[in-house]
Amino acid sequence: MKKIVTEYRVPYADTDQMGVVYYGNYMALFERARNELMRACGYTYKECEAEGFMLPVVHAEADYKSPAKYDDLLEISAWVQLVKGVRLEVACEVRRKGEDAVLVKGFTRHVFVSTKDFRPCPPPQRFLDIFKD
């Protein structure tokens, strides 16, 4: 399974009064990594929508191990951990660049839905060919 790593420098706006990255901002980092994963695999979200389906998030989880701070250079890894029926799960891990310790790990669960009626639909074969083990 393809795994990508994308970098992100923490701006001051992402931190809270405690001086650490606000917990909710990690979901935005997960989304950035998901988009880069799709792009690296040659199947962008824009193409998904043009082909008649979308992938809304229906569940998200994150385990916070250690905080990131202003100006940290982060590496966000992402990979598909499950494609089953109409479900897709993308796992993510966040580390400081050059360090092994995981700061945050988690995943997002998505459901394939039609752009016409937002009802669940099977994933296209092209998607399965790219992302399924």
Per-region residue spans from a language model:
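Hot-dog-fold acyl-thioester-processing enzymes
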Residues: K2-H59, V113-D133
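HotDog/MaoC-like acyl-thioester-processing domains
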Residues: K2-T6, K69-L73, Q81-D133
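Residue-level recognition of the GNAT/N-acetyltransferase active site
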Residues: P11, K65, R96
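Short linear motifs in intrinsically disordered/low-complexity regions
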Residues: T15-Q17, Y64, A101
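Hydrophobic beta-strand-centered segment that forms part of the acyl-chain substrate-binding groove
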Residues: L37-L88, V104-G106
